[in-house]
Amino acid sequence: MSVREKMLEILEGIDIRFKEPLHSYSYTKVGGEPDYLVFPRNRCELARLKRFSNQEHIPWMVLGNASNIIVRDGGIRGFVILCDKLNNVSVDGYTIEAEAGANLIETTRIALRHSLTGFEFACGIPGSVGGAVFMNAGAYGGEIAHILQSCKVLTKDGEIETLSAKDLAFGYRHSAIQESGSVVLSAKFALAPGTHQVIKQEMDRLTHLRELKQPLEYPSCGSVFKRPVGHFAGQLISEAGLKGYRIGGVEVSEKHAGFMINVADGTAKDYEDLIESVIEKVKEHSGVTLEREVRILGESK
């Protein structure tokens, strides 16, 4: 029996798609074909996938909702898992629990509806709750580390564990999950009671700032670089004269130099080449070496 036949038998009922390009699902609108693109509906299906991948020695990767990543044009080997369907969110007192595939922006709106404060900083961050925990997503002085109470993960051995915020050893755009091989299943956030109008005003203010400063009208991978100590990446790129700098179909945004936008059917290679070129030119101009925030995954074509 071939691996594919075995997969269809053992993983019957799970939504598995073969040779389906990731550019249809990524925020950058680039990305080649994974071997198997999977949309699990619940933790049980995710655990079945993990057991099968371990038994058959098939690589697997969870992409959340593919927002702060670039998938290379040659695609990704093994299972690629999109968790959009694991999206339940519940509220218990001042605590919100959200599954990994829940939309982060929508989760902040649920907090607003329940007059819970603390999540406002994330009201414009695209992506999933799982990805936000993985990256310790943040903006405007707030970050996931400030509000996370605990999270459930599926370990690389297929076990479910509950981790505290301390266990995750959060740092700037970093959590211990990045090295552990575990996958976020859900997260609990400890918020505080607030006033609906005040929370809404703050979310409206931050949303307006994003719309003013960020090129939301174009496909992009979000913020490309981490913030260098004592500097702002966008400012360094701008000072190096790189606004509008373009390779292939991807260019440095004129609106915010910390973003690279897909303006003309760009490819992952265009993104990668532009990122490397910007790092080199900023280093030449200011002496500062930029570090990527966006993850680049998969194989070149």
Curated annotation (Swiss-Prot):
GO terms for molecular function: FAD binding; UDP-N-acetylmuramate dehydrogenase activity. Its cofactor is FAD. Its EC number is 1.3.1.98. It is found in: Cytoplasm. The active site is at R173, S223, E293. The keyword Nuclease does not apply. It catalyses: UDP-N-acetyl-alpha-D-muramate + NADP(+) = UDP-N-acetyl-3-O-(1-carboxyvinyl)-alpha-D-glucosamine + NADPH + H(+). GO terms for cellular component: cytosol. Coiled coil: none annotated. The keyword Cytoplasm applies. Cell wall formation. NCBIfam families: murB, PRK13905.1. This is UDP-N-acetylenolpyruvoylglucosamine reductase. The gene is murB.
